Amino acid sequence: MGYAITLRLDAAAATVVEAMWQALASRGVSDEALQLRYPPHLTLAILADSADPQLLVAAARQCAAQWPKLPSIFASLGLFRGTPSTIFLAPIVTSELLGRHAALVSLLAGEPVDPYYAVGQFVPHVTLASDLADSAAAVAALGLSPLPITSLLDRLDVVRFRPVEVLESHSLANI
């Protein structure tokens, strides 16, 4: 188990991403995202199970109090290569998104943040499927996906996983 702090996609964009998850499942590529039973999201930080959940909740509260909803455009598919690999939806990276990530990570100083989520290492993404043995099948299943996807990142959640348990969820203010 571990923890994550995530920005969730608005309902309209989430519906599009869930259809992409369904396409992957129906083609026999992966149903992992559907099995999570957690809405489409962009993870800002993953932390080890040894993290202090009270500190994570406090950091999320502080950020949520200052952050309005964030307009985002998911323009392309990406792939974290390897065996297994991960296919993801990539946003157009903005200074606002990177600034939010950096602000959150600074509040988590001393906590066991996964190195992939450190400032300067962070690759913003929405995971579509991971643990893929055949990334070509995933790309083929998503070939006709409606890109770009315009979204508002409208909630900030602190979750414990697996299974996913939302510890705290904050609606972000309107722009």
What are these regions (language model features)?
Residues 84-85, 92-95:
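Charge-rich, low-complexity N-terminal segments
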Residues 7, 89-92, 158:
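Short beta-strand element of the conserved SAM-dependent methyltransferase core
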Residues 75-84, 119-122, 156-166:
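Short proline/glycine- and acidic-rich turn/helix-capping motifs at secondary-structure junctions
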Residues 1-71, 95-152, 168-175:
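Basic, often amphipathic N-terminal segments
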